[in-house]
Curated annotation (Swiss-Prot):
GO cellular component term, pick one: cytosolic large ribosomal subunit
Any GO BP: translation
Stated name of the protein: Large ribosomal subunit protein uL14
Naturally occurring in which organism (per UniProt): Pyrobaculum arsenaticum (strain DSM 13514 / JCM 11321 / PZ6)
Protein family membership: Belongs to the universal ribosomal protein uL14 family.
Known role: Binds to 23S rRNA. Forms part of two intersubunit bridges in the 70S ribosome.
Lineage: Archaea, Thermoproteota, Thermoprotei, Thermoproteales, Thermoproteaceae
Length: 144
């Protein structure tokens, strides 16, 4: 029997299927003013990679990832945070049939509950991320 329900997540319980575009050990720029400039992805929240041997966890737009700051303010460097993927270069298909691809990858640093650490987001934000994380939608200036 398949397991049903019971697992609580942060954000909305559903998500659109988005082709993963950011994987473990990816260096990704930060799209907010939290003080971090470049982060390395060290985990994907909710991804269970022990079911298939040697499968590398991947994250798409709207997924929460675990990151470590590589460049930025000295007090933030080498610290572990959570982040939300708001842009990815890899094209993904929306339910209406359109294909979306951004010119860069980007994450927004958040608390474990999903609240952004910064007060503004630079550049466009994918619609899938704003639907799943309403607090990010409040800070986004451009939603694509």
């Amino acid at each position: 029997m398949a397991k049903r329900g019971g697992k609580r997540t942060v954000g909305v319980p559903y998500r659109f299927h988005v082709t993963p575009g950011i994987f473990m050990n990816s260096l990704v720029p930060v799209a907010d003013n939290s003080g971090a400039k470049l982060v390395r992805v060290i985990g994907v929240v909710g991804h269970y990679s022990k079911t298939v041997h040697r499968r590398i966890p991947g994250a798409g737009v709207g997924d929460m990832v675990v990151v470590v700051v590589k460049e930025g303010k000295p007090e933030l460097r080498r610290q572990i945070f959570r982040g939300i993927v708001v842009r990815q270069r890899r094209p993904y298909r929306r339910p209406d049939g359109t294909w979306v691809a951004f010119e860069d990858n980007a994450v927004v640093i958040v608390t474990p509950e999903g609240d952004p650490k910064g007060s503004e987001i630079h550049g466009p934000v994918a619609m899938e991320a704003t639907l799943r994380w309403p607090t990010i939608a409040n800070l986004a200036s451009i939603v694509v």
